[in-house]
A protein has these predicted regions:
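Gly/Pro/Ser/Thr-rich low-complexity, intrinsically disordered segments predominantly at protein N-termini
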Residues: 1-230
Length: 230
């Protein structure tokens, strides 16, 4: 009597592993079969899977960034905020950035029928351990090439924040003014007190942001977005 081996359905699709070289379609197919997996990214055709997240070096800074961006979103109709949303950038790149801001109507990105971001959001934020992280190298090049207009990287262990603005195909660092305030050039009124954020003073971060939200530039931006929605 012969028997036919039965292969469990869960084993017919190989699991994702760090370093796998995959197409975006195969990456998505495997990722969807691993619902327990919270974060995996495809960068230049290579799979990167996140390690367990530490509190002080990632989870808390991440939450502070989301709080900062959430206040901006609340005051800016027509702007949408994503937290760890998968982004289909191109055939070799599907990152899952810590945070993103996108212009809903008339912006660079869209929401697909299956509810993914497609195209480059206007702003992406990543929390990185240090300058050795792939957030500062491979991802930076991918975001630049796909025309993410602004890219903010918080290098936690080096206590530094780099805010890049795309100009003529290259990323140029935005520098703080004499008061230590950094200002987005894509999202008027999105002001950041760099030192307050690095010190974990979310209250001061939000106070400075509120000042940006009270400017004429922000009011004009809101009027423009409102007109796009009408």
């Amino acid at each position: 009597m012969t028997t036919t081996p039965v292969i469990a359905a869960s084993l017919t699709i190989p699991p994702l592993e760090n370093g796998d070289k995959l197409t975006r379609w195969e990456f998505e197919r495997r990722y969807q079969e691993m619902p327990h997996l919270k974060k995996a990214e495809l960068i230049e055709g290579i799979v990167y899977m996140a390690s367990p997240l530490r509190f002080e070096s990632h989870a808390e800074p991440h939450a502070n960034i989301i709080g900062w961006l959430a206040l901006y979103k609340a005051a800016t109709p027509g702007v949408r905020l994503g937290d760890n949303a998968t982004v289909r950038l191109d055939i070799d790149n599907e990152p899952q950035p810590d945070a993103l801001l996108r212009i809903d109507k008339g912006g660079q990105s869209t929401i697909s029928q299956d509810d993914y971001v497609e195209g480059a959001p206007e702003l992406i934020v990543e929390i990185a351990a240090s300058s050795a992280s792939y957030d500062v190298h491979q991802k930076l090049n991918v975001y630049r090439r796909n025309q993410v207009q602004e890219y903010l990287v918080w290098r936690f262990y080096e206590q530094e924040i780099d805010w890049f603005r795309l100009q003529a195909g290259e990323y140029i660092k935005l520098e703080p003014d004499s008061d230590g305030i950094m200002r987005s050039q894509i999202f008027p009124g999105l002001w950041l007190d760099k030192n307050a954020l690095l010190m974990g003073d979310l209250g001061k971060v939000l106070v400075i942001l509120q000042r940006g939200l009270e400017t004429a530039e922000h009011r004009d931006f809101v009027n423009k977005l409102t007109a796009n929605h009408s």
